[in-house]
Swiss-Prot record:
This is 5'-3' exonuclease PLD3. InterPro entries: Diverse_PLD-related, PLDc_3, PLipase_D/transphosphatidylase. The catalytic domain contains two conserved PLD phosphodiesterase HxK(x4)D(E) motifs that accomodate the phosphate group of the nucleic acid substrates, with one nucleophile histidine residue forming a phosphohistidine intermediate and the other histidine protonating the leaving 5'-OH ssDNA/RNA fragment, resulting in the cleavage of the phosphodiester bond. The homodimer has two independent catalytic domains arranged at the dimer interface. Residues 1-38 are cytoplasmic. It is an enzyme of class 3 (hydrolase). Disulfide bonds join C77-C239, C81-C237, C366-C487. Belongs to the phospholipase D family.
């Protein structure tokens, strides 16, 4: 039995009624709270933005140091890149007025020189911008002489000029280079014969690491008025220009006394941009993918696509047509002893025509220095054109006409182009198409993929079709006397 308990109510002290705040103080408190939230938000955004900015600056400065995985694409380039095809049309070679036309090589070079502010790097095969080598007073040499005069003004006005040139294997005029040295330019000769048994056949300029020229034209007065040349000038495209400078820096390094090709190139020479991860650029107002390739493979640091691999990739990815304009086409190691067959490009073209039904057109140069053995290989390719196999390969020879005076100019009157265009891609290079140029000789190419009409690709296609349909293009079975004695392949 429970004891009887007396319960008492537990008394809790009554709370005093809270005093109400005046309305103006409440509103002030709410305003202060709102302001604090905004300040915190702004602070957070500032920290995030600063972090993003520092990350971008870090990648911009050190992005080449293998920070990207195999499946990660580098950041796009936001430069307003402008590409302009430039040509040298030999005197006396005339197209109809309505034909495709482009600015001249000399006009483009002089414009680049006039606009140079801080630096000019030139990779070159040889130098003869005056006609001293011919011991004549050839009037058409004036454009080359003017280019040399303007080059001599750069160093005195504070522009750093560096020239990498192939070391000659024999006697070669050096007056141009001596004049440039005296004006303050720096010159290094690259002994490619010792390094790879080849030559430095590259032809490009980089101006202020912002603009560049790349193409077939040598530093030769004939390349401006007596030889048919094609190249591209890229304006306001520092992303690509800086990448091309890396190729130049490799030549510059190899031009030092006693230098050799590194077994592994130091990281500053590496690139992020290649066949697998091309640079995303805005080219002439249109999205495009671009990268630079190099030859021979020992001169390709990490990330750099070899020139031959890049060329074959364009061939293998063509689905409609492949148009090629090149001075020499030889599926051999041209300078090899004993002789060696080299079918890498030839196989790719045959496969494209036979397996995928791609229309293949080759416009090959014919002049007094053409290798006669080229004819048999060209006939072999052309023989694949067959209604039963539906293979469509055509070959034509381009002959630059010459009068008696022009015919006496040595190493002139030839189509020196080195490019390819498909329905998808543009390839503009500095090499002839035979094995040694890709395995031993230094060369560079620009590759661009761009959709739509009016871009670089369609402009190059128009140039090819103009030349292909011109009276200067001849079938392989044309009569030799119909084109004069300049062509050795008929």
């Amino acid at each position: 039995m429970k004891p009887k308990l007396m319960y008492q109510e537990l008394k809790v002290p009554a709370e005093e009624p809270a005093s109400e705040l005046p309305m103006n103080e409440i509103e002030a408190w709410k305003a202060a709270e709102k302001k604090a939230r905004w300040v915190l938000l702004v602070l957070i955004l500032a920290v995030v933005g600063f972090g993003a900015l520092m990350t971008q600056l870090f990648l911009w400065e050190y992005g080449d140091l293998h920070l990207f995985g195999p499946n990660q694409r580098p950041a796009p380039c936001y430069d307003p890149c402008e590409a302009v095809l430039v040509e040298s049309i030999p005197e006396g070679l005339d197209f109809p007025n309505a034909s495709t036309s482009n600015p001249s090589t000399s006009q483009a070079w002089l414009g680049l020189l006039a606009g140079a502010h801080s630096s000019l790097d030139i990779a070159s095969f040889y130098w003869t911008l005056t006609n001293n080598d011919t011991h004549t007073q050839e009037a058409s040499a004036q454009q080359g002489e003017e280019v040399l005069r303007q080059l001599q003004t750069l160093a005195p006005r504070g522009v750093k000029v560096r020239i990498a040139v192939s070391k000659p294997n024999g006697p070669q005029p050096q007056a141009d280079l001596q004049a440039l040295l005296q004006s303050g330019a720096q010159v290094r000769m690259v002994d490619m014969q010792k390094l790879t048994h080849g030559v430095l056949h590259t032809k490009f300029w980089v101006v202020d690491q912002t603009h560049f020229y790349l193409g077939s034209a040598n530093m030769d007065w004939r390349s401006l008025t007596q030889v048919k040349e094609l190249g591209v000038v890229m304006y306001n495209c520092s992303c690509l220009a800086r990448d091309l400078t890396k190729i130049f820096e490799a030549y510059w390094f190899l031009g030092q006394a006693g230098s050799s090709i590194p077994s592994t190139w130091p990281r500053p020479y590496d690139t992020r941009y290649n066949q697998e991860t091309p640079m995303e650029i805005c080219l002439n107002g249109t999205p495009a993918l671009a990268y630079l390739a190099s030859a021979p493979p020992p001169l390709c640091p990490s990330g750099r696509t070899p020139d031959l691999k890049a060329l074959l990739n364009v061939v293998d990815n063509a689905r409609s047509f492949i148009y090629i304009a090149v001075m020499n086409y030889l599926p051999i190691m041209e300078f090899s002893h004993p002789r060696r067959f080299w079918p890498a490009i030839d196989d790719g073209l045959r496969r494209a025509a036979y397996e995928r039904g791609v229309k293949v057109r080759l416009l090959i140069s014919c002049w007094g220095h053409s290798d006669p053995s080229m004819r048999a290989f060209l006939l072999s390719l052309a023989a694949l054109r067959d209604n039963h196999t539906h293979s469509d390969i055509q070959v034509k020879l381009f002959v630059v006409p010459a009068d008696d005076a022009q015919a006496r100019i040595p190493y002139a009157r030839v189509n020196h182009n080195k490019y390819m265009v498909t329905e998808r891609a543009t390839y503009i290079g500095t090499s002839n198409w035979s094995g040694s140029y890709f395995t031993e000789t230094a060369g560079t190419s620009l590759l661009v993929t761009q959709n739509g009409r009016g871009g670089l690709r369609s402009q190059l296609e128009a140039v090819f079709l103009r030349d292909w349909d011109s009276p200067y293009s001849h079938d392989l079975d044309a009569a030799a006397d119909s084109v004069g004695n300049a062509c050795r392949l008929l």
